[in-house]
Curated annotation (Swiss-Prot):
Its EC number is 7.1.2.2. InterPro entries: ATP_synth_asu-like_sf, ATP_synth_asu_C, ATP_synth_asu_C_sf, ATP_synth_F1_a_nt-bd_dom, ATP_synth_F1_asu, ATPase_a/bsu_AS, ATPase_F1/V1/A1_a/bsu_N, ATPase_F1/V1/A1_a/bsu_N_sf. This is ATP synthase subunit alpha. Its main location: membrane. GO terms for molecular function: ADP binding; ATP binding; proton-transporting ATP synthase activity, rotational mechanism. It catalyses: ATP + H2O + 4 H(+)(in) = ADP + phosphate + 5 H(+)(out). The record marks 374 as: Required for activity. It comes from Bifidobacterium animalis subsp. lactis (strain AD011). PROSITE patterns: ATPASE_ALPHA_BETA (PS00152). It is an enzyme of class 7 (translocase). Keywords: ATP synthesis, ATP-binding, Cell membrane, CF(1), Hydrogen ion transport, Ion transport, Membrane, Nucleotide-binding, Translocase, Transport. Residues 535-546 have a biased composition (Basic and acidic residues). Gene3D superfamilies: 2.40.30.20, ATP synthase alpha/beta chain, C-terminal domain (1.20.150.20), P-loop containing nucleotide triphosphate hydrolases (3.40.50.300). Produces ATP from ADP in the presence of a proton gradient across the membrane. The alpha chain is a regulatory subunit.
Amino acid sequence: MAELTIDPATIRKALDDFVEAYTPSETPTQEVGHVATAGDGIAHVTGLPGCMANELLTFEDGTLGLAFNLDAREIGVVILGDFVGIEEGQEVRRTGEVLSVPVGDGFLGRVVDPLGRPIDGMGEIKSEGRRILEAQAPDVMHRHPVDQPMSTGLKAIDAMTPIGRGQRQLIIGDRQTGKTAIAIDTIINQKKNWESGDPKKQVRCIYVAIGQKGSTIASVKQSLEEAGAMEYTTIVASPASDSAGFKYIAPYTGSAIGQHWMYNGKDVLIVFDDLSKQAEAYRSISLLLRRPPGREAYPGDVFYLHSRLLERCARVSDDLGGGSMTGLPIVETKANDVSAYIPTNVISITDGQIFLQSDLFNAGQRPAVDVGISVSRVGGAAQTKALKKVSGTLKISLARYRSLESFAMFASDLDAASKAQLNRGARLTELLKQPQFSPYSMEQEVVSVWAGTHGKFDDLAIADVLPFEHGLLEYVDRNTDILTTIRDTGDFTKETEEALDKAVDAFRETYVTKAGKPLVDKKTAPKSVTPVDQEQIKAGKAQEKK
């Protein structure tokens, strides 16, 4: 029998023929895992060894999930959306993508969910691209100093705690103290800039509603529509009925939409209403995923939760487009306690805070800004020259009034100077009252604050302060060019001050008080006296009667 031999050349030729004839299968391969447990907006998934942190996963019913915990045995997934249809044993697939949202001018005037999907029934949104949610904040070398004003239209804020474009200014206070009202008024105040058509003045606004009632979000949208502000505003809505995952990512969605405009040279204003509810949602997610709790049961990285969000608000250098994103985060306190965990975290991250006092709000002082605690660390450099000149003594005067007011409650007799301070402080406090949806222009704020700090309201009854102010602004606008001069120059010169002084004196001669009496008796020549002199005269008359 002949011996069987194999020729190496034959083997090589057979292998080459096989390789040349081989065609790989066109069937795609994909990692598939299975739901081990699901509930409360959380799912534990097994069988996805290649999954990345923050990767998007898809469940059988199309619901998206965010890979949050990567353990050796399983993955902790935050379900983004309704989790009712997710059950044990269902398949889970990787997408190979991180969470991103569509961006572009098509979002102006629209209401979207935290995934960027329209929920206002107005059809699809035409996007200009996509932007990842976990984007890096601009570094120090690519930031520009804050030196342009972001006017709120509120006298109490623009005069004492000014905000600049690119600043992070915290609005903090108890529930029902007017925090959202300040943010909405600031958005409405940008209407004139938008209608000017000047890209350098226009501000695109984003309102992020986190854990709010659906009726509240609808009310905000209606208010913006009635004021004509919705055309330059985007609302990112995550109402109280949404899952904790949606409340967690909603602020990042709004920030991603705003960053697209910022890096294209646009100015953006974003309101986070409010970050307390985002922190609570993040706490519930972390506890359900068995992450170690810390102070007040919040996870250890809750500071990073807010810092990486708010650090994206900046005014960037020309190399990155020269745009800006101004952040107005809102935080709710309990019993005016600003030393709690989340409030102190956000205060340390932001560039200042506007503290709203519930006692002031209940006393009718609205906006209820507490002058003593409120501060703007960088906004002073952005304040217009005119407003800076007239408001220099306002904050000090009000602070002295507050301290003297509490002392006067227990003092039976005060000297004339103290009474004069109380008299002016009460009228300045009344002057700073402002109803909602009635923002002032910068030049109107200058005239109003100047008149208040220069004693033009001192001899008025408290009830006459606001009517006198409204009449004065109308008189100055109708009979002089003072408002136009301040608006065009942005300055308050000595000549403008002299002209305003004459205009105020002329208006005083025509003003009739609420009691029906003229403010100035034309039959008697007015005597020039100081408020202290007036108090001394009154005290002398009282002694004569005795």
